[in-house]
Every structure is written in C-alpha cells, then in structure tokens.
C-alpha cells in the first residue's frame, strides 16, 4: 500500500514533493491499465483521501459526500461543486469517508481545475481483490452531469456568476 502524503505532512500545501510522492503509485496503476490512484489517509489507512492530484466526491441519494482530511489540498473546484450541489438541493457532507462506503455510492468522480469532473466507473482494491462498479454503463451519472454543465456554463459566461467566482480582466 502506497500513500501520497504523510500524517501531519505537507498534503494541504501545493508543493512539488506532494506530486513526487505519488509517482510510483501512478506508474504502477498505469502499467496495470488504470487511469488514476485513489489514496487512503496516511494515518489510519481506512478513509478516502484523494484521487491522484484531484479531490474525490461521491453521490449517494440526495447527498454530495467528499473527504475531510488534513492531508489533502483543498480544491477550489470541489468547493465550487459543493456550493452548486447545495443550490441543487443536495446535502453536502464533508467528513471522513471510510473506504467501504464506496460500495454505497450511486456516482463517484474526481474533481479539479483541469477536468472539472472526471467520473469514476469502477474502483478496484488490488490489495483485497475487490471491485466496486459505480457506473454500470461507464457514463457519468445525472448529478455529475448537471454539476459539470452548471460549473462550465458559469466559467464560460453562458450563465450568470452569482457567486463572485469570475473576474473579468481587460
């Protein structure tokens, strides 16, 4: 089991060492055909942390669930998605998320600046030889789809920015 950050380390700060620590796990994952690595917390090794260089969130019923951790970089994209989720009527839960909870998600995704939302269709636990299929058809779920389109519409100016997120530079 490999970890991206150390307990009480620099995981919450954008520094090169945080990315370097993930290179080995990323190489192993890519050599086995995986797109990304889902990291657990470095202290108790049982709570979801983040997905490669991006934040993780899951949708279950009417809840947007994202890890609260002292070892991950806070994401502006995740924060924006949480606001949009609340505005859509979802309950936002920011808390420690046990790994086993993956089996209960209707949708899951990683989120960050580059992709905004990258849906996750399956998570494989190679240590325990378990697979969790989240998107049976491999497509984004309806909540991820709505969140993605809403945020992109605000970013591109197709919808008004009522949050003060966009600055016009002349």
What are the functions of these language-model segments?
Residues 1-170:
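Helix-start/capping segments and mature chain N-termini
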């Amino acid at each position: 089991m490999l970890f991206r950050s150390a307990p009480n380390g620099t995981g919450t700060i954008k520094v090169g060492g945080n990315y370097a620590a993930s290179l080995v796990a990323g190489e192993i994952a890519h050599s086995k055909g995986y797109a990304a690595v889902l990291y657990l917390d470095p202290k108790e090794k049982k709570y979801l942390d983040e997905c490669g260089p991006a934040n993780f969130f899951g949708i279950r019923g009417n809840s947007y669930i994202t890890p609260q951790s002292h070892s991950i970089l806070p994401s502006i994209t995740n924060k924006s998605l949480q606001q949009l989720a609340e505005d859509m009527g979802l309950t936002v839960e920011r808390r420690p998320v046990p790994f086993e909870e993956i089996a209960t998600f209707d949708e899951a995704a990683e989120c960050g600046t580059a992709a905004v939302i990258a849906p996750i269709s399956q998570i494989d636990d190679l240590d325990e030889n378990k697979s969790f299929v989240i998107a049976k058809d491999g497509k984004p779920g309806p909540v991820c789809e709505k969140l993605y389109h809403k945020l992109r519409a605000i970013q591109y100016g197709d919808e008004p920015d009522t949050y003060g997120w966009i600055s016009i530079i002349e």
